[in-house]
Design a protein with these regions (language model features):
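A structural motif corresponding to the C-terminal lobe/cap of the Radical SAM core domain
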Residues: 1-148
Length: 149
């Protein structure tokens, strides 16, 4: 009635996330599309509008300095390995050129961040190959194909 529309934001690639977890999120998104369009004729403007009103994009989990995710041991270890970040004995990041390079690499959260060698920064338990395929499918608007990975 009021024309207010809630928008869910989806994030993939969290530490510990498995491919089945990602598929569960995709299934929920597709269910939302189904519910939003169930009484509408496919191919109509109304159907398209209702379908597009459901956010089908996903951001990549990004470890921003100072966040709880950034302070977790697996994330610190990955960033140390892939960006050369150093941490104090208390787990605080050392502000040096490696940190600067990492921060400068933080761009659009919809994109996969890569290290200086082009390797993806993947905090999840999803293989790099599958994560990159999933990210590509999302970018192409083919989110449902993730269910077949």
């Amino acid at each position: 009635e009021a024309g207010i529309h809630g928008n869910c934001t989806w994030i993939m690639g969290y530490p510990g996330e498995k491919l089945d977890d990602l598929k569960t999120s995709v299934g929920f998104i597709l269910w939302q599309v189904e519910k939003a369009t169930e009484s509408l004729a496919s191919g109509t403007r109304e159907y398209q509008g209702a379908s597009e009103a459901v956010n089908q994009n996903m951001f990549m989990a990004t470890a921003y300095p100072g966040t709880a995710m950034f302070r977790t041991k697996p994330v610190r270890e990955r960033l140390s390995r892939q960006f050369g970040l150093k941490f104090s004995t208390k787990g605080r990041v050392i502000a040096d050129s490696a940190l600067r390079l990492y921060v400068e690499s933080l761009g659009d959260a919809a994109n996969v961040i890569s290290d200086k060698n082009g390797n993806p920064i993947n905090f999840s338990d999803i293989s790099d190959d599958k994560l990159l395929i999933a990210r590509s499918l999302i970018s192409q608007g083919k989110i449902g194909k993730i269910l077949n990975l």
